[in-house]
């Protein structure tokens, strides 16, 4: 009995389970180069080795947008001026061997990026206003973690043994080891049916990347059984959890300086606290009022507001899934798929820990501060606060934050306190907070998919439902702003509202909630055949959507109602508003067109291609797919020679969605050359 399948013959990167990056390029499956084949023991053992070596470059062609410069997201932007940002040497090799009904498959890869490993970056050229990076004090270098993840690496990807048997006239196949799953039908958008394998964004960004290098294999036992000629069942159990590797801090496409590899410190610019920097150092050294000490305010008003601690990883067990696929011959041999997966989050939410901080004696600090402040310092503090020196002196004796004066500030983040005592408490609290990446466990996914043909078109679609999807609540800067503006009350043992949660000393903040979520995808791959002067031409279109239910998507903050953060992570405290936050419904589409001219010259084939991506309505949650108004396109040309040598050049432009689009100034040109044997 033969297990039937209607899977499409085209692959795309990052394809199934991939990131929804606007610069996605189709990696078409052309004819494969002849691998090195071998056999032993009178052909009882056979196998092959398939190797690809490549060289690639990525060039920034758009200058830095000075408005794209948040202190906790801007390392990647400041690190690279226009010019070469990545130069990669890479090798990937596949080994497969089989004996009778059994076999083994191993894939390994290694790369080296000279721009990360051997060069200084351009941070100092762009350091205006002056801010520390995650590499401080060596701001023009990359962190050790970034160098390891994005600069060089060598690892085994897939590594599994497999077997094929007949059990009771039913064909059975099984795999044991590190493997990639290909469930569902979606191509360009994540959070669909195929959710088992994480994605390595550092690999995806490398010039010349391939989907087989981007999807992270997971350790699992899986099997497939042909129950009937038309019905099959597949199941797996995963015993080692792995996370998605987002762009490391300081790399060209990085979106966060905190919650990716290489992040260590959250900062805020608090110029109102500059006059208190020396006073804080002196009082904390003397142990006044329980001040813990630590990094103080630098001359530009930059202050540490949290340390980034080790991840809170999900457990290794408890991830499993089952799928049934049915070929309905009476419906034009349409394939239907039905899925269930229980998995742990691959992308993090924010966790903050206040448990190690014991608080302050603000009365003792106020007494010392009042005597220590010179008239010059008092004038500077009063000027920053916009009040008279007499008014400042009136509140110096008050150890708590004056709410009337606080409300008078036009920028709550950069004017967190209105008196010296509150300012000293703010500096101290910020030195003690620890934030971490938290990966939520036990997410359930129920899915349905179909795949059929209509004339020359392959038509596909899928629907996934998660009754308990974790999504972020507050934007990063709103969490930090809530902390800073209420630091004196918190230090005094009071209860404060941070990101909609009532917390006090000793508490933890889990910045997520669970909601019902539906994700849909509908698309087609159309083969035009010889058309418009091409020997072959095909197009791809995919429409995707996200729908959140079972929650109002808003929370009560310290100063009114806020909506949950959107995909752009724009904060209310930084001037973003309701239109920038999450919506219950969000939509986007991707279009691809590619043609081929065969044998243009002496065995050389040319394949021009174009990709257009548009998020046309609604904002996703923080780890979703869509930012309303965001657009991108890529145009390029691929040349291949005798199915072994390939070269490609492409141009990508990102635009739309205003300040929410963190990639809006990352236009680039990429080129690569590959040789397979």
Language-model regions, residue ranges each:
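Membrane-embedded beta-strand positions in outer-membrane beta-barrel channels/transporters
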Residues: 48, 90-94, 158-160, 220, ...
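Transmembrane beta-strands of outer-membrane beta-barrel pores
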Residues: 55-61, 110-114, 118, 178-182, ...
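Transmembrane beta-strands of outer-membrane beta-barrel proteins
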Residues: 47-55, 104-108, 172-174, 233-235, ...
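Outer-membrane beta-barrel "beta-signal"
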Residues: 665-677
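Outer membrane beta-barrel
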Residues: 98, 102-262, 266, 588, ...
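Short loop/turn motifs that connect adjacent beta-strands in outer-membrane beta-barrel proteins
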Residues: 34-49, 60-64, 95-104, 162-174, ...
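Solvent-exposed loop segments that connect transmembrane elements
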Residues: 62-79, 117-145, 197-206, 249-306, ...
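Detector for outer-membrane/organellar transmembrane beta-barrel domains
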Residues: 86, 341, 348, 460, ...
């Amino acid at each position: 009995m033969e297990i039937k399948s209607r899977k499409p013959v085209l692959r795309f990167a990052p394809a199934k389970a991939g990131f929804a990056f606007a610069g996605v390029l189709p990696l078409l499956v052309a004819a494969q180069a002849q691998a090195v084949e071998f056999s032993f023991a009178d052909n009882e053992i056979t196998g092959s080795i398939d190797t690809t070596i490549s060289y690639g470059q990525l060039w920034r062609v758009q200058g830095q947008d000075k408005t794209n410069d948040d202190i906790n997201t801007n390392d990647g932007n400041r690190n690279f001026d226009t010019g070469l940002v990545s130069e990669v040497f890479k090798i990937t090799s596949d080994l497969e061997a089989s004996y009778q009904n059994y076999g083994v498959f191993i894939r390994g890869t290694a790369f080296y990026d000279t721009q990360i490993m051997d060069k200084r970056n351009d941070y100092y050229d762009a350091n205006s206003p002056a801010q520390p990076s995650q590499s401080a004090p060596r701001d023009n270098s990359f962190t050790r973690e970034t160098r390891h993840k994005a600069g060089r690496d060598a690892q085994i990807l897939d590594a599994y043994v497999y077997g094929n048997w007949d059990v009771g006239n039913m064909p059975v196949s099984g795999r044991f080891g590190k493997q990639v799953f290909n469930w569902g039908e979606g191509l360009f958008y994540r959070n669909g049916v195929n959710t088992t394998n994480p994605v390595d964004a550092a690999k995806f960004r490398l010039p010349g990347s391939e989907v087989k290098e981007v999807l992270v294999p997971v350790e699992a036992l899986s099997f497939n059984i042909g129950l009937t000629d038309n019905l099959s069942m597949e199941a797996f159990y995963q015993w080692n959890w792995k996370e998605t590797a987002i762009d490391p801090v300081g790399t060209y496409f990085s979106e966060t300086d905190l919650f990716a590899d290489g992040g260590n410190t959250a900062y805020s610019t608090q110029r109102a606290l500059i006059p208190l920097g020396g006073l804080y150092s002196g009082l904390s050294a003397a142990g006044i009022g329980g001040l813990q000490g630590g990094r103080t305010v630098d001359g530009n008003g930059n202050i540490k507001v949290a340390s980034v601690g080790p991840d809170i990883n999900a457990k290794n067990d408890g991830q499993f899934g089952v799928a049934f696929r049915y070929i309905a011959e009476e419906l034009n041999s349409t394939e239907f798929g039905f899925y269930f997966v229980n998995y742990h989050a691959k992308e993090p939410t924010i966790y903050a820990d206040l448990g190690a901080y014991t608080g302050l004696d603000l009365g003792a600090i106020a007494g010392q501060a009042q005597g220590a402040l010179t008239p010059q310092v008092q004038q500077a503090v009063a000027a920053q606060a916009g009040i008279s020196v007499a008014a400042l002196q009136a509140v110096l004796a008050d150890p708590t934050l004056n709410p009337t004066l606080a409300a008078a500030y036009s920028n709550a983040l950069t004017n967190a306190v209105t008196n010296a005592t509150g300012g000293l408490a703010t500096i101290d609290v910020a030195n003690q907070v620890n934030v971490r990446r938290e990966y939520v466990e036990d997410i359930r996914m129920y899915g349905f998919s179909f795949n059929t043909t209509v004339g020359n078109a392959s038509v596909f679609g899928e629907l996934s439902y998660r009754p308990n999807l974790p999504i972020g609540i507050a934007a990063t800067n709103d969490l930090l702003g809530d902390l800073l503006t209420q630091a004196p009350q918190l230090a005094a043992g009071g209860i404060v509202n941070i990101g909609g949660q009532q917390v006090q000393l000793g508490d933890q903040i889990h910045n997520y909630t669970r909601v019902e979520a539906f994700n849909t995808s509908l698309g087609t791959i159309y083969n035009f055949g010889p058309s418009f002067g091409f020997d072959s031409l095909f197009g791809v279109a995919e429409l995707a959507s996200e729908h959140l239910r079972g929650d109002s998507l808003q929370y009560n903050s310290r100063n009114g109602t806020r909506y949950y953060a959107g995909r752009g992570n724009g904060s209310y405290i930084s001037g973003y508003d309701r239109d920038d936050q999450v919506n219950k419904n969000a939509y986007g589409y991707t279009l691809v067109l590619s043609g081929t001219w065969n044998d243009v010259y002496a065995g050389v084939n040319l394949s021009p291609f174009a990709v257009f991506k548009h998020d046309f309505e609604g904002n996703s949650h923080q780890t979703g797919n869509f930012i309303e108004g965001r657009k991108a396109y890529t145009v390029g040309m691929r040349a291949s020679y005798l199915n072994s040598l390939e070269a490609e050049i492409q141009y990508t432009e990102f635009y739309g969605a205003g300040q929410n689009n963190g990639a809006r100034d990352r236009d680039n040109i990429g080129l690569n050359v590959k040789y397979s044997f």
